[in-house]
Every structure is written in structure tokens, then in C-alpha cells.
């Protein structure tokens, strides 16, 4: 069968003869071609890192962040089309607030991820344009440890130990697989994540980019937080020194 839509890509409700929904595949490409984002679950927390494009020097610092709180204990990081990702974040936040109002307790991370996945599926099923964004959800507590979910533009929802999305996702996954992530604490994960982002960057194309990080773990008392700028800077400096050291060894 042809990989070209040939008329079957005009609506998200239309299957091709070989069972594909081209509109959803196109939405996935919006994530696949976006800046690299990786999320890693370590021994005492979860870290997510995005290589964010800064398209203008006139932007204020940290304009258009990719990472947010859903509630105090769950963070979300959106990849792909920014307005679509922001809409998914708002939906997740609204669901968490309704849960808190109804049950007087924070909405569990798996319920949040499942709710967003179902929303994406129903939205697409209703012959609307698919969301061109994916969303990582992360949490940590003493009972369950770290948890990490990714909801994709198709509505698929999986739990991961670590994962990467974006244009350098395959190279990033290969680097992650070299690490014994279950032995690393969040401070070590921050450094290694910064190193991975720098390793997979295309020096000729990936210019005007900025690393954005979020974490949740034992040291944050289970609260999702943005990684302080001084910690990010220190991680970048460590990563540069590590890469220079590796180059000298080679």
C-alpha cells in the first residue's frame, strides 16, 4: 500500500484500505519533528528535559514554557505544537481540579493520563483535527516511587522507565539505554539529561535553543517543580566538561 494519503487523509474519521488514519500520523509528525524532549525515572524521582527553540532574542526569559503543574504532585511536559500542548495541559488541570473538588484528594497520575488519552481519542473520533502534541506526566511518592506516562497524539498512553520524543529521539534513547537509570538520583539524572541533549544536538541546525527542566522526587517532597536555573546552568557546565573529557579520551 502507498504511504501517501491519496484521498484518505482528508478527515481524521477515515481509515485507509490498510487500516491507517493519516491525519493522526501527520499529527504525530508534529511531535517527531519538534525539539527533543526526554524524561527519565531514577531511583528517587523523575526528571524531564526539553531542548526548547528560542526563535527571537526579544522573548522574555522562559517564555512559552513546556512544563507545568497539573496539581501539586503531578507535572506535565508538552511536546509538539505549542498551542495544542497548552490545551492538553489546561484539560489535565481542569480534570485534576474537578477530581479534587469531588473526592477531596489529589487526582492520581494514572487517572490524569488516562483522562487526557480518552479526551484526545474522543476529540479525534469526533472528526476534529487531531492534537499535534504529546504529553509526559510524572510524579513521585514514597509508596509507588516515580511514575512516568506519555500520552501520544493518537491517544495511546503508556507508562515508561524513560523515553524520548522529538527530532533526535532515536539518538537520545540510545544514550539513555547506556545508563543504569535505576541507580541514579535526580541530581545525577539532571546532569546526564543535559549531556544527552547536548550529544544529540545537530550543531549546524540546532541553534538558539535553551534547555528547560522539571523534576519531582524525594528531594522535592513529591512536589513537581521547575529545576532552578542555577542547577540547570551547573548541569550544562558539567555536560560540556564531560563531553570535552570524552573527546580527549578518544
From Swiss-Prot:
Highest taxon of source: Eukaryota
Keyword Glycoprotein: no
Gene Ontology biological process terms in this record: ubiquitin-dependent protein catabolic process
Cell compartments where the protein resides: Cytoplasm; Nucleus
PANTHER family, per the entry: PROTEASOME SUBUNIT ALPHA/BETA
Subunit structure: The 26S proteasome consists of a 20S proteasome core and two 19S regulatory subunits. The 20S proteasome core is composed of 28 subunits that are arranged in four stacked rings, resulting in a barrel-shaped structure. The two end rings are each formed by seven alpha subunits, and the two central rings are each formed by seven beta subunits. The catalytic chamber with the active sites is on the inside of the barrel.
Protein name, per record: Proteasome subunit alpha type-3
